[in-house]
UniProtKB/Swiss-Prot annotation:
Source organism, top-level taxon: Bacteria
Entry's localization field: Chlorosome, Chlorosome envelope
Sequence repeats: 8-17, 29-39, 40-50, 51-61
Protein name listed in UniProt: Chlorosome envelope protein B
Region (4 X approximate repeats), start-end ranges: 8-61
Tagged with keyword Cytoplasm: no
One GO cellular component term noted in the UniProt record for this chain: chlorosome envelope
Similarity remark: Belongs to the CsmB/CsmF family.
GO molecular function: bacteriochlorophyll binding
Function: Component of the photosynthetic apparatus which may bind the chlorosome to the bacteriochlorophyll a protein monolayer.
Repeat as UniProt keyword: yes
Length: 75
């Protein structure tokens, strides 16, 4: 009969299920935190890139105006 080593199969399955659930939740949390961090980094980079493009456009416009006024015949 029994020698005192009963295996609690249901308990082991419950423990494994709980462990896998926690691992999955941790992966979801890591992915969520990574996305938040990327968004926090991308926002200032996007603003900086937009400002840089606007500055470049302003410089290009000023250069074209100066070239046009230098080339235009004087009255």
């Amino acid at each position: 009969m029994s020698n005192g080593t009963n295996i609690d199969v249901a308990g082991a399955i419950n423990t494994l299920t709980e462990t896998f659930g926690k691992l999955f939740q941790m992966q979801v949390d890591v992915a969520n935190n990574s996305l938040k961090a990327l968004a926090e980094v991308a926002e200032p980079l996007g603003k900086t890139a937009t400002d840089l493009v606007a500055s470049f456009a302003n410089v290009a416009t000023q250069v074209l105006q100066n070239v046009s006024s230098a080339v235009a015949p004087k009255k």
